[in-house]
């Protein structure tokens, strides 16, 4: 665990040092849980969004996109339940004056019990080797059985309390489990209370005439209120989907773990509208399709897992998370939910407008059911960096840090490097750069030794480095170096476009989804 925490700190430092992520307003000492994306971060983020957008709207004839406004009529959020129920249960430690989410404190305690069980299993696996039967060990070992029984009892109480919105019971679980404040080490807790997460502001020129509005806490409602607009103007037939990428805002009291949980963040959501009664079959299909999309990135299938929800939101009849193994444990990067017809029904009720679909095949009108896929772009960004960040020791004891990003997502696709700045090599390198830059995001670098320049490109994840040397001036060939293997190949300049295009195009990534 300590090693993973150290790795996470290195990753955060790497993001700042190499222009991926900066603390926002840093010259004013920053703003808690708010970050800016730097010159390489914004390119990686845009490439991720393009991979998702094309995977949805380009590869599916029945999915289209919209871009809804951040400000919406305040009744939208009343209808969706956000005004009354978009809350977090908060608890304060009287000694440290620190505020925590009560549910997160309990979840962290459960995770510690899981770690105890995992350590017991790992020790036994090393002891017994190939003959080890994990299932039998878990069911028969007294220590594991004790930990599991403790965990199950706490989890059952926790689930009941969350479902019943029982704040007193949440506090009692914290007391009974002897959960301490990480800062003060004491158990001097206040009562648990609810805190609404929406940012409110006013729209209008005078205080008396101003309307209270909200920064949207999710992008989904912009899709639901535009259901009829898109369906009618696009002549869409069910099943069909509407996709959107956009900013959302939540007044997170406990924002932590770098860009994993922020107050301003970006979502990629797709709402898929289906016939009532067919939603669970579509939920299963989208569940597998979304996992395939993530694993297609090549970061390792074992790094991903499903986490099915035991506690369902009031509007859902099925829900699962796709989790990725971050340096701080498995965490959600995407949610897939069967939202039933709750959202459209609520907006029909509050707006007084009929929001239904006439199904010509069935000869009847109905309120469609919805399957939602929802990704936090910033979380996805962090998972990609965590999976790509690699420290290597090379022959001769030299080391390097390399971001083994999927080539199609890399911020810079290729770097053009003259071996030296004299004898026309720099001019030749710039000529090659201008030839390629209309199709690829390129970088030119002539400063420092060629080895140091390779290391800089490795650190930002550039898949290819093209070296222009004296042989180039004689026979129009260059050396092309691949980031992951550091292998070098001599190729003619007129083949560069063909070689690089095949390996870094988004198409090469999208074809893996077929």
Where are these regions (language model features)?
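NTP/phosphate- and nucleic-acid-binding module
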Residues: 1-514
